[in-house]
Swiss-Prot record:
PANTHER family in alphabetical order: 12S RRNA N4-METHYLCYTIDINE METHYLTRANSFERASE (PTHR11265:SF0), S-ADENOSYL-METHYLTRANSFERASE MRAW (PTHR11265)
EC numbers, comma separated: 2.1.1.199
Protein name: Ribosomal RNA small subunit methyltransferase H
Catalysed reaction equations from the record: cytidine(1402) in 16S rRNA + S-adenosyl-L-methionine = N(4)-methylcytidine(1402) in 16S rRNA + S-adenosyl-L-homocysteine + H(+)
Underlying gene: rsmH
Function per UniProt: Specifically methylates the N4 position of cytidine in position 1402 (C1402) of 16S rRNA.
GO CC annotations on file: cytoplasm
Record carries keyword RNA-binding: no
Amino acid sequence: MILEIPHIPVLLNEVQEIFKNLKTGYFLDCTLGFGGHSEALLKNHPDLKFIACDQDQQALKFSKKRLKDFRNRITFMQSNFSEVLEKISHKEELRGILADIGVSSFQLDNNERGFSVNSDFLDMRMNQNSKISAYEIINTYTKEQLTSIFKDYGELHDAHFIAEKICLERSKNLIKSAKELYQIIGKGKQNHRKISKATLAFQAIRIEVNQELKVLKDFLEHLENLKPKNCILAIISFHSLEDRIVKQFFKKWSKNCICNEKIMRCECGNNHSLGQIITKKAISASKEELLKNSRSSCAKMRAFYFNNLDNK
């Protein structure tokens, strides 16, 4: 049976380039999705063993079929990527870690998942076992809470006005679909930005539903505590707020000195670096990839090499 692939992995060539020198040990794909990145890496690294995680049951089910030829080298696990480091074995043997923290094309295009502005549902949960969906947020959050979401996560200047419109409409009838919400928010653009106001608002709601920024910070903090040895980490993000967080952590990890900037002379020992930043600038999709997959336009990848001396 030929499987119809529901998602194109972004920055596939660039991911393979980052991990090209891996030989043995374990590779952790924290956000397996539909297996595109892992499939390519499994083919090119025959001596690597894989731990593949995702919180989406549908994605895991599909990927188990897609990667069945590699079943002797791969362990599957359902988990949010912020929790996966606490659950896995072979931590000391990790040589590569990949986290692609975007929404898959399958999730965006699946009407029942409620991610798209054209959806008849209002859900947006990446983990369908989660209790809070977009429906609860839109219909129960206070005007102040909604304003905060649109301002902080969507960076929308008229966040208060959008929240006010939502509260007014739901006082008449509960908002039950993404289509309805789209009509309420409107189609306009946010000043000079190319992305529509509705897209930014939907993105903000999705971040709140899935606690995406908190999850990312938790994951990076767990890595910081773990201090992997001789391990490459690559993170693909699709939102400027996420990319900013990754950039800040990588910068922090690369520093030897952790003294207060106001101190004239180092007092910390100047030996706190966990490794080196591999990517001086975030890697973006090539022109060729953009032509094939327009959804890769927001993707940015940063990579870090852990070689901390304390763990040697």
